[in-house]
Amino acid sequence: MTKLASGIVILALASTAIWAAPAFAQMGKSNPGSGEETRSAPGGADIKLGDAKPIAPPKIEADEASRAPILDEGKAVESFTVLTRSADGKVSRSSPSEEMRGLVIEDMKKEAGKGSMKLEKSGDPSFANEEEAGRQVFGPDDRVQIQNTKVFPFKAFGYIEAKSKTGTGSCSGTLIGPRTVLTAAHCLYSNDDGGWLTDVLFAPGLNGFEDAPFGAYAAESTSIVEGFVTNYQGFYGSVVPWDLGIITLAEPVGDTLGWLGYSNYDGLGDFTANIVGYPGDKDPPALMWRATCEVVAENVGTENFGYDCDTYPGSSGSSVYAYDEGLKQRVVVGVNIAESPEYNTAVRLNASYVALINSLWK
């Protein structure tokens, strides 16, 4: 794999200040859920899945790094303005707080891998037990099907459908709170296809269109950062650092199913990445698959990191998580967003994004 900075679009920020003390945002801790029976999905039998075309991960072309926008501190801060669309179509705008302003500027000055908060890495113990994970390998493909999606952590991962101007698309997402789902911004907003996607649904633990063990849940609202819209210059590489989205569900399904934790490890280096989602190249569709690969420190940037885990259309929005042996928890450190000629790409949960998620967490 090639060093991250050479092939992936990294946010170009004009700043001459030296790197200062690390900034932290309070991490979100995981919760395995109550295990009680879930409530009926909003709309019940009226909610139907299966008409969607998997949303392809945007491609970062080789020349896009040189065309990425160069932002000063003020523009970078304003890029973290939150845009929220409610289910009835109303869009609100929330400017960054003073705390957020400080974190964004701090993140601009950081050097990748330089920090005191380290990940005590280990493999996810769920994958060490084939019976628990219900896994099956097909041919040379290193992705693994999760057959038992009704156990934690797999019931915290879900299938997303949403409507654009030209059709219905599917992505993947992860519960990180009772009503909070983490995904990619391009699963919620299309710069090339009319803006906001509508009628967003989340089906946790989906195991094929005929087996939705926990139902499908409607979004109360969806949120992205304004930089994903205002910094777009006609090519995806111009908005890579802002490709993170939040779905707020109308129902607190996470209280029952549980959710994953999330954090900004400012000293993030080598670690084992786990990606669980719904790639669209498998038949039958809408089955849950996982991919695992090693991320090397040289491919970890301050806003993004690269890896060679297999991902396909439909995998967009999947969380990238690591197992922290010290915490004995699965911790989300990024979101799978794009592909490039050399490797796949995640937006990294830095201090700014963790604070943003905390502000929207429900």
Map each language-model feature to its residues.
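Catalytic nucleophile loop of clan PA
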Residues: 310-336
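Catalytic histidine site
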Residues: 152-201, 294-300, 322, 346
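Bacterial N-terminal signal peptides
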Residues: 9-17
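Chymotrypsin/trypsin-fold serine protease catalytic domain
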Residues: 240-314, 344, 349-358
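Conserved catalytic-core segment of clan PA serine endopeptidases
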Residues: 136-155, 161-166, 189, 194-254
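Protease-domain processing segments flanking chymotrypsin-fold serine proteases, especially trypsin-like
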Residues: 25-175
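Sec/Tat signal peptide C-region and signal peptidase I cleavage site
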Residues: 18-25
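Bacterial N-terminal signal peptides that target proteins for export
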Residues: 1-8
